[in-house]
From Swiss-Prot:
Minor component of the type IV-like pili. Essential for pili formation. Keywords: Fimbrium, Secreted. It is found in: Secreted; Cell surface; Fimbrium. The N-terminus is cleaved by the prepilin peptidase EppA, which recognizes the class III signal sequence. A motif (QXSXEXXXL) lies at residues 14-24. One of its GO terms (cellular component) is extracellular region. This is Minor structural pilin EpdC. It comes from Methanococcus maripaludis (strain DSM 14266 / JCM 13030 / NBRC 101832 / S2 / LL). Residues 1-13 form a propeptide. Disruption phenotype: Deletion of the gene leads to completely nonpiliated cells. Contains an amino terminal motif QXSXEXXXL, which is part of a class III signal sequence.
Length: 154
């Protein structure tokens, strides 16, 4: 009679079961790591967009200050950030920047004092609840604001 070779352990399915459990555990770990990487990439993209928005707000304020302090009319061109369109919101206007947009900063005076008038070809004259010395940029998903400008704008 021929005797078959036997494995040194009796639980023949145990090795494959342990291997499956280990692979599932590794898959779970890599899924969590991948989710963290994707969230971090989205956060980087949002922070880069916010940095661009702050730069636009600083430029907007600089043009308004230059028009006010030098008593000159300034014509500035604002463009979308890559393929991101945005809306510049003032106290009584909303300017949609969907393409190259020319904005005119003109110093004016009325009974309430001096201010810088903002004129543009695609202005929506809506009443916003924004103070005269504040500007906001909306990207739809989030809004970046500058609430303490040096000059009043309308």
């Amino acid at each position: 009679m021929i005797k078959m070779l036997q494995l040194p352990f009796n639980k023949k399915g145990q090795v494959s079961f342990d291997f499956i459990i280990a692979m599932l555990f590794l898959l779970l770990i890599f899924a969590f790591m991948g989710q963290n990487v994707l969230n971090m990439a989205k956060s980087f993209r949002d922070s880069e967009t916010a940095e661009h928005a702050h730069a636009i707000l600083d430029s907007f304020e600089n043009y308004a200050i230059m028009a006010y302090s030098k008593d000159v009319t300034v014509n500035a061109t604002f463009e979308p950030i890559g393929n991101l369109n945005y809306t510049i919101m003032l106290s009584n206007k909303s300017i949609s920047v969907n393409s190259s947009t020319n904005i005119i900063f003109q110093p004016e005076t009325d009974a309430n004092g001096d201010y810088v008038s903002i004129k543009c070809n695609n202005v929506d004259n809506s009443v916003n609840t924004i103070p005269l010395n504040a500007v906001r940029i909306s990207f739809g998903d989030f809004t970046v604001s500058k609430d303490e400008m040096e000059v009043n704008i309308r």
